[in-house]
Amino acid sequence: MGSIEAAERTTVGLAAKDPSGILTPYTYTLRNTGPDDVYIKIHYCGVCHSDLHQIKNDLGMSNYPMVPGHEVVGEVLEVGSNVTRFKVGEIVGVGLLVGCCKSCRACDSEIEQYCNKKIWSYNDVYTDGKITQGGFAESTVVEQKFVVKIPEGLAPEQVAPLLCAGVTVYSPLSHFGLKTPGLRGGILGLGGVGHMGVKVAKALGHHVTVISSSDKKKKEALEDLGADNYLVSSDTVGMQEAADSLDYIIDTVPVGHPLEPYLSLLKIDGKLILMGVINTPLQFVTPMVMLGRKSITGSFVGSVKETEEMLEFWKEKGLTSMIEIVTMDYINKAFERLEKNDVRYRFVVDVKGSKFEE
């Protein structure tokens, strides 16, 4: 085994068959493999809140059967004849994308996540007409351009959530020039992405305030994650005292919420960076932005280049993800708990250690 040239394979995964979102075994054919492809045996796959949206058709764009999962870590089993970046036996990662046009402004700038013709790692159609399926499966085939090198020394189960949640917070801090030590940042929402935000911001030398709707995560934020301050959004006095204090806020909340209370926390030229996938309009009055030259912006995961840079940063700083490892037979329960925000802070599925039965 060493190279692959257009041989089809079957694999088995867990798929949602309808908007109930219940995952059951599903055997399917992997797309044709070619000279630029990498055949990967999946070891671990993270569970993201967007997976929950997809399996339940919350965004009205789901196609079934659907194998979710876009935080994939696995072992290279074979490579195509043109593959130069990877070799058999290496541990690699795959994130949210498996294709792009390679000729637009975004692709030319190596920010392929903003390509209008990007191809999602699941619930999409590949260039050969086959439906893409995700990481809750035994194996996958991915073009080498979208496969991520993983630095030696990083535990594979730790890497899985970094391929989405980790780079999601790292990318805007890098792009918007917010990596300077001493900045004061806010993390709105302390879930899977939010806990990554605290870790990355602290590692950059920032003063970090966690903002939440209740005080139930205060101890975790301050003692376990090392945040410097904790604000409860309903605490009028505390919010007023914190006005004009933050250089940026990373807003990870995945449901509709008012923006004005958080805009008031920003300094002049401060940035509110939206990351949650929300299918209802958000509202604010324009003076909240105008009178402080503040910005409401967004950011979407990160490029392969940014992901590899973030993984090196993670290794250099000695950071770890706070995860709960589960096997495939627990995945439906994991989604139930995720829907109730009952996870600390990210589920990772041990795919290699799971049994698949059709």
Curated annotation (Swiss-Prot):
Expression by tissue: Most actively expressed in stem, hypocotyl and root tissue.
GO biological process: lignin biosynthetic process
Gene3D superfamilies the UniProt entry points to: Medium-chain alcohol dehydrogenases, catalytic domain, NAD(P)-binding Rossmann-like Domain
Cofactor needs: Zn(2+)
Single annotated GO MF: zinc ion binding
Amino acids binding Zn(2+) 2: C101, C104, C107, C115
Family annotation (SMART domains): PKS_ER
The protein, known as: Probable cinnamyl alcohol dehydrogenase
Organism, as annotated: Medicago sativa
Organism lineage: Eukaryota, Viridiplantae, Streptophyta, Embryophyta, Tracheophyta
Gene label: CAD2
